[in-house]
Amino acid sequence: MATKILSLLALLALFASATNAFIIPQCSLAPSSIITQFLPPVTSMGFEHPAVQAYRLQQAIAASVLQQPISQLQQQSLAHLTIQTIATQQQQQFLPALSHLAMVNPAAYLQQQLLASNPLALANVVANQPQQQLQQFLPALSQLAMVNPAAYLQQQQLLSSSPLAVANAPTYLQQQLLQQIVPALTQLVVANPAAYLQQLLPFNQLTMSNSAAYLQQRQQLLNPLAVANPLVAAFLQQQQLLPYNQFSLINPVLSRQQPIVGGAIF
């Protein structure tokens, strides 16, 4: 009899604990409709467990993401890939030129890289065109610096002090590059003066446009040589008088045999 009473009390205790207990899914993938079947009405209304709240929030976020059209997401990804492809193609177009410039003149390469972030270059392309033209003469100036550093330094000093360089730097640099063939032209003067005069015409654009600026340029370039050597001064004066001397144009060989006015040779 006592055993029956104890067994009944145990069954009542188990029944009471089963009615008051509720399930808390930790890592369950069951939908919320199934979970609510095991929850008491009081806990589902206002006393829900934090783990269940996090699970329902996760389900709501996943549902909102899945509701977006898949085609819209694909269009966004394709647009991003297209922009990256265009940027890569533009970089590949300039890589050979920039690599060659980096090998020839690293300083000019760094200056070119900084040019993209220059507000003046982005705002005013016309103002940046002389700087782009100067880049064409950098390889020749770099070779001059390697072969003859003293001549390169003298070239830079003349570039900063010459009015022609300030007004038109590309024309000035082109004129300076033409001066590198002066030794060969000097030998041509001795051998054939008429051919020398004909040789100067197609290469000297500054003489055809502005002869006064050309004469001033030659004086500024070769003035240190004229001070050191009177023969050079006489030669320069003869070059200035030659275009205006009719006798020189008729027979340059006999003209060079005549006395040089104001020169050191008679």
Swiss-Prot record:
Tissue: Expressed in endosperm, mainly in the peripheral regions.
Signal peptide bounds: 1-21
Keywords: Seed storage protein, Signal, Storage protein
Pfam families: Zein
InterPro entries named among the record's database cross-references: Maize_Zein_Storage (IPR052508), Zein (IPR002530)
Entry keyword Zinc-finger: no
Record-level Gene Ontology MF annotations: nutrient reservoir activity
Superkingdom of this protein's organism: Eukaryota
UniProt feature coiled coil, ranges: none
Family statement: Belongs to the zein family.
Note from the entry: The alpha zeins of 19 kDa and 22 kDa account for 70% of the total zein fraction. They are encoded by a large multigene family. Structurally, 22K and 19K zeins are composed of nine adjacent, topologically antiparallel helices clustered within a distorted cylinder.
Summary of the function given for this chain in its UniProt record: Zeins are major seed storage proteins.
Assembly with partners or alone: Interacts with OP10 (via N-terminus).
Protein name: 22 kDa alpha-zein 4
Species this chain originates from: Zea mays
Gene: AZS22-4
